[in-house]
Amino acid sequence: MTNIRKTHPLMKIINNSFIDLPTPSNISAWWNFGSLLGICLILHILTGLFLAMHYTSDTTTAFSSVTHICRDVNYGWIIRYLHANGASMFFICLYMHVGRGLYYGSYTFTETWNIGIILLFTVMATAFMGYVLPWGQMSFWGATVITNLLSAIPYIGTDLVQWIWGGFSVDKATLTRFFAFHFILPFVVLALAAVHLLFLHETGSNNPSGIMSDSDKIPFHPYYTIKDILGALLLILVLTLLVLFSPDLLGDPDNYIPANPLNTPPHIKPEWYFLFAYAILRSIPNKLGGVLALVLSILILAIVPLLHTSKQRGMMFRPISQCLFWLLVADLLTLTWIGGQPVEHPYITIGQLASILYFTILLVLMPIASIVENNILKW
């Protein structure tokens, strides 16, 4: 008799995706982040659902409803901090996942890569709207500053901003619609993630060496399920330490002050995971130019497959490209640091240089390095 997991219509999908999936035998821990992102997403949807049961999306009660969750709801504080710090873990896993794709040339699976970019944008939009919901000072001013960037779009900019606001300023209508979008978008992310997996399983996984691995595949279960469980336990450990010992480490103290449209915080800045893009935005003294650079800082990932000039797929055997990759990582860390600093003398210049370097590495240096490496190997 045939096993039920191979015949039942629903079980068959699960079997082909997570049990009998042929997987390269040499994929490293860098391939764990996909499953970790799935865990983060499920955790977020669950904690978010419980938070939504007690949250009110009204400007007069939003802040106090979050306080009520933390003080009066059974284990409300842990649900709230799991949700807030879970976002940080989500973005750490996301950036590691994208970095892995860049390093090992996984972007040559163009459909999977492009769906991934759409996913990245959607998750960023969701996180931004979620940051607005507690209606603290940084929530209000963050929403005001970031939505205002759309006014840089010629001709329709101002009308577009007021249409998003639902009025002439960030107010009740804005908060209500942001809550609605913040609630629905994770389910869109879930659907997109399924499409992402669908396209990935059409081609099969990449591997560290970047060569075809059809001749050496092993079943996903038990080899990689156990490996993913180890990664998940480490993720849960870090998240638990963060939530139970220093839940506000990555947050902004200004968000514990209720939103006040008449009082601007001294330094308006987003959550740490957006600081690199915020630094690129601020480094250009022109509003439209800054907005374009901000969008391009993520959208540049879409043209990475077009700039792949190497005869090899990954960077495992390409030392010059490896150096450039780690220079890019260092540059992004520098941008993250700059994004959190005030706009004054040394930081402005460092930010501008780091922004130029970011685009130069991806658009100019990496393609040139690949050609040089091809020539060294006489390819």
Swiss-Prot record:
Against InterPro entries, the record matches this protein to: Cyt_b/b6_C, Cyt_b/b6_C_sf, Cyt_b/b6_N, Cytb/b6-like_sf, Cytochrome_b, Cytochrome_b_C_euk/bac, Cytochrome_b_N_euk/bac, Di-haem_cyt_TM
Main site of residence? mitochondrion
Q: Which Pfam families match?
A: Cytochrom_B_C, Cytochrome_B
For this UniProt record, the keywords arranged alphabetically read as follows:
Electron transport, Heme, Iron, Membrane, Metal-binding, Mitochondrion, Mitochondrion inner membrane, Respiratory chain, Transmembrane, Transmembrane helix, Transport, Ubiquinone
- SUPFAM superfamilies the record matches: a domain/subunit of cytochrome bc1 complex (Ubiquinol-cytochrome c reductase), Transmembrane di-heme cytochromes
Tell me which residues bind heme b b562: H83, H182
- Whether Mitochondrion counts among this entry's keywords is yes
Give the cofactors, semicolon-separated: heme b
Q: Which residues form a coiled coil?
A: none
**Free-text cofactor note:** Binds 2 heme b groups non-covalently.
- Transmembrane portions of the chain: 33-53, 77-98, 113-133, 178-198, 226-246, 288-308, 320-340, 347-367
Q: Where in the cell is it found?
A: Mitochondrion inner membrane
Looking up PROSITE patterns in the UniProt record yields:
CYTB_CTER, CYTB_NTER
Q: Which residues bind a ubiquinone?
A: H201
Q: Its Gene Ontology biological processes?
A: mitochondrial electron transport, ubiquinol to cytochrome c
Topology in the lipid bilayer: Multi-pass membrane protein
Cellular component, GO, one term: respiratory chain complex III
| Family to which this protein belongs | Belongs to the cytochrome b family.
Name assigned to this protein: Cytochrome b
Naturally occurring in which organism (per UniProt): Phoca largha (Spotted seal)
Q: Gene that codes for this? A: MT-CYB
